[in-house]
Design a protein with these regions (language model features):
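C-terminal lid/capping helical subdomain adjacent to the catalytic/cofactor pocket in oxidative enzymes
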Residues: 148, 152-264
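Active-site substrate-recognition segment that forms the wall
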Residues: 1-122, 127-155, 171-173, 180-182, ...
């Protein structure tokens, strides 16, 4: 079995494989940019992730937030995200990636996706055109006295939104991940942009079911999956939820912390 999981480059690798299921798929690259605080005193004052609401007509992925994170063991303060544009499919990819991915088989999908997502296209153009001062103005909705000298813009990463065929619109822009599998199950490809690590387990379970159905759909296979993920394909009652929450907290060392928060 061949599994293609190369982030933004998955599309380019998939297009080299001779399977019918790849036809009609395209990708649109979007870079993620953040304002990163350089003032350690300000960083020390913030201890949470604070969300606002997306602007009127803006996509869900644009929800701005002020976020404390630990990067390489060091506490940091970020604000964003802001969308940028680069034709690269990876942060260190080639400027030709987008153009290499376009073919006669996916042009209708891509044109249809853009035509039916004009508000998103307009949003991305506005984001790319934003100056540093414009971004600081957005930040001041969270921190009124934010100073430009305390912040800098950093390109965090690159993602590729999946574009696929649609019978009604010609093409459709996907905001999640997509698992593509050949009919014989010998090739599986993971494409798209995941909202975070919380979805990783579900995605890989989907991959396993498509790649190895003859193993997964057996009594032994189901037993092994239930050992690893007790709530997999189980109706989640309050009792089962609390039981597994407790196990997770113990494994992560969070149980005592939650008890202290409740008592306070």
């Amino acid at each position: 079995h061949v599994f293609i999981g190369a982030g933004g480059s998955s599309l380019l690798l998939l297009q080299k494989v001779e399977i019918d299921e790849k036809d009609g798929y395209g990708g649109f690259p979007v870079s993620g940019e953040w304002l990163v605080c350089k003032n350690r005193d300000i960083i020390a004052q913030h201890q949470a992730k604070v969300y606002s609401k997306a602007g009127l007509g803006d996509p869900p992925m644009s929800v701005p937030h002020l976020d404390t994170r630990y990067i390489d063991g060091k506490r940091e303060l970020l604000f964003g995200p802001f969308a940028g544009f680069s034709p690269k499919f990876l942060k260190e990819g080639s400027n030709l990636d987008l153009f290499k991915s376009i073919s006669f088989k996916n042009i209708p999908s891509m044109l249809g996706a853009f035509w039916h997502n004009l508000p998103l296209t307009e949003y991305l153009i506005k984001q790319v055109a934003m100056s540093f001062s414009d971004r600081m103005d957005d930040l001041r909705k969270f921190i009124k006295d934010a100073k430009e000298e305390d912040w800098e813009v950093v390109v965090a990463g690159q993602r590729v939104q999946t574009i696929k065929r649609d019978a009604y619109e010609g093409g459709k822009l996907e905001f999640g991940t997509e698992v593509i599998s050949s009919k014989d199950g010998k090739i599986t490809c993971l494409m798209g942009a995941s909202p975070g690590a919380s979805t990783a387990v579900k995605i890989m379970l989907d991959v396993l079911e498509k790649a190895f159905p003859e193993r997964i759909n057996t009594a032994r296979g189901q037993e092994m999956l239930n050992q690893m993920v007790p709530t997999w394909k189980t109706e989640l009652t309050k009792e089962i939820f609390e039981e597994n929450l407790l196990k997770s907290e113990e494994a992560l060392g969070l149980g005592e912390k939650r008890q202290r928060e409740i008592s306070q």
